[in-house]
Structures are given as C-alpha cells and as structure tokens.
Amino acid sequence: MLDYTFQWRVVWKRLPDLLEGAILTLELTILSSIIGLLIASILVVWQKSDNSFLRNFTKTWISIARNTPALLQIYMAYFGLGSFGIHISSYVAVLGAIAFNNAGYMTEILRGGFASISKNQNQAAKGLGLNNFQTYMYVIYPQVLKTVFLPMTNQFIWAMMGTSLGIIIGLQELTGMTTFLQSQTFRPFEFYFIAALIYILSLIHI
C-alpha cells in the first residue's frame, strides 16, 4: 500500500510563487522567440548573400546552434563569458542562449518557407515598382510566415521547455521555483505535478 498523504494545501499557499516562476518562463519564451525570429529574418537573407563573410557567418551560427546542446550554450553564455570578465545574470544568459538557439533553427525553417514561394512573385513585385526591400517585407515575408507557422509553433514549444535548463545556473523560472519550493516543504510530488499542469495548460492550445 502507498504510505503517502497528499497535502495540496501546502501547494496552494505557495501558488503565488509558482505563478511567479511561470510568468518568468513565459516571459523568457516570448522574448527569446521574438529575438530569435528577428535574427533569423536577417540570417536567412545573408544565407544567399553575395558576400562570402555573411554566408559563412550564417552557416557557422546555424551549425553551432543545431549541433551543440542547449545546456552547453547556456554554460558558454554564463560561465564562458565570465572567463573574459563579462559577467551577466542567469536571466540574460538563458534569454541569450535560447534566442541564439532559436535563431539557428528558425533560419532553416524560414529558408524552407522562402523555397516554397514562387519566383514569379518577385517578378510581379518588381513590375509594380517595388524595390528588393519592399518586396521582401510586404510581399514575400508575410507569405513565408504564414507557410512556416506550424513549424514555428513547435520551436516556441521547444523554447518554453528550454527555459527549464535555467535551473542549472540558479534561475527560478517555473522548474527552478518548483524545485526550490519542494526542497523547502518536502512535497515533491504535489509541486512537480502542479508545475507539469501549468506547462501543459500554457501550451495545450498551441
């Protein structure tokens, strides 16, 4: 027989702290996704640039982002930069690392979206007198975003999961706060169960 007495009232009393961690998680997820998308929107253009430096820079970024663990990227941001006297908070380290990772993956997602757009649209836009920037921003890019919406939502979900790695460097996002609270109250099941529900409810409609 299970000899465990559930004490949900303990969780209820500390629910504001859990929600504080959840808000931090959501904030990091949204910001890292926006920053990642903005960077990716530039990198995807540089991929086809005539400038070899820009092409190689983009290739290197994508390679590092996709072929190294996200945890290592966080370590490099937090501890690696510290070795050179650049000390940043755990919040900035996680935000920067997740945004860096997002940018690498989103660049490839956008590249696939651009490949699906007919070249005739470029010609039509030029026929209307639009320059390259206007064609990119007002004709091509909106269609690409619509095409890649589903893959981008998957990346958003990954970003939220990735923020939990912040616990390693002391960030009290949802997972970090949950671990801290259960260590104080010795109610691991209740706290982790509620944390899991918060994650699920945050992402279930995406």
Q: Each predicted region: which residue ranges?
A:
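Transmembrane alpha-helices and adjacent helix-loop boundaries
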Residues: 1-204
